[in-house]
């Protein structure tokens, strides 16, 4: 690929520019982009039998033993505090039983981390449950709706604690046109410049961050 569409830090999506590979100094960013261009096998893996799903769930919990969550393969895992681990297990059990949950701890006790741990667990460790519940043959992403002032915090924490691909469906300087740009280049696998190459069946991102107002405005685009 000769050029990359660059989203500059702290600038709007409308300020994106096409740049040649050789002038981009951060080669790790290029490598990360290239990795995101390939559909992971786990997103397309066939649904398993009930016995296989139970075994997968047990194996999953072993990986999460002691509340360790890793941002990437081979990276040093971060550890949840005991009460955060207990909160995560409660969220997980409610999710498995199809129950809604509300965390109402005081500020600063790690509610966000507990929810993020559940996201990592659901997407990478408990994939089958998500797909069976949604009757989907491919993995579906997670939608996080939060106040605008907290979106940056959510993104930093998700990137710090997990290996999930998270994008922010919001732009301070752009309206619907900019959101269509995000959808065109960030949502699906394939080349946004070549419509026929885009696979609309599998989402590239794992987590979409946005606000309540944008959710209402773009409800048709965000509906599963």
PLM features per residue range, with description:
Residues 1-75:
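Long, charged, low-complexity intrinsically disordered regions
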Residues 47-224:
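ASCE P-loop NTPase motor core, strongest for the SF2 helicase catalytic module
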């Amino acid at each position: 690929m000769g050029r990359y569409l660059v989203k500059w830090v702290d600038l709007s999506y409308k300020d994106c520019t096409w740049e040649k590979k050789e002038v981009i100094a951060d080669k790790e960013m290029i490598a990360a982009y290239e990795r995101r261009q390939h559909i992971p096998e786990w997103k397309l893996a066939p649904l398993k039998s009930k016995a296989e799903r139970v075994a997968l769930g047990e194996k999953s919990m072993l990986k999460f033993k002691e509340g360790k969550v890793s941002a990437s393969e081979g990276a040093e895992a971060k550890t949840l505090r005991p009460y955060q681990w207990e909160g995560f297990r409660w969220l997980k059990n409610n999710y498995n039983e199809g129950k809604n949950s509300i965390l109402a701890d005081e500020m600063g006790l790690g509610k966000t981390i507990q929810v993020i741990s559940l996201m990592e667990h659901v997407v990478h460790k408990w994939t089958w449950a998500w797909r069976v519940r949604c009757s989907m043959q491919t993995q579906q992403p997670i939608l996080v709706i939060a106040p605008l002032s907290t979106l940056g915090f959510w993104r930093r924490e998700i990137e710090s604690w997990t290996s999930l691909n998270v994008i922010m469906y919001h732009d301070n300087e752009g309206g619907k046109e900019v959101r269509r740009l995000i959808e065109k280049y960030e949502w699906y696998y394939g080349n946004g410049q070549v419509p026929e190459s885009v696979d609309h069946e599998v989402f590239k991102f794992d987590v979409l961050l946005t606000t309540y107002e944008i959710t209402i405005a773009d409800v048709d685009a965000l509906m599963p």
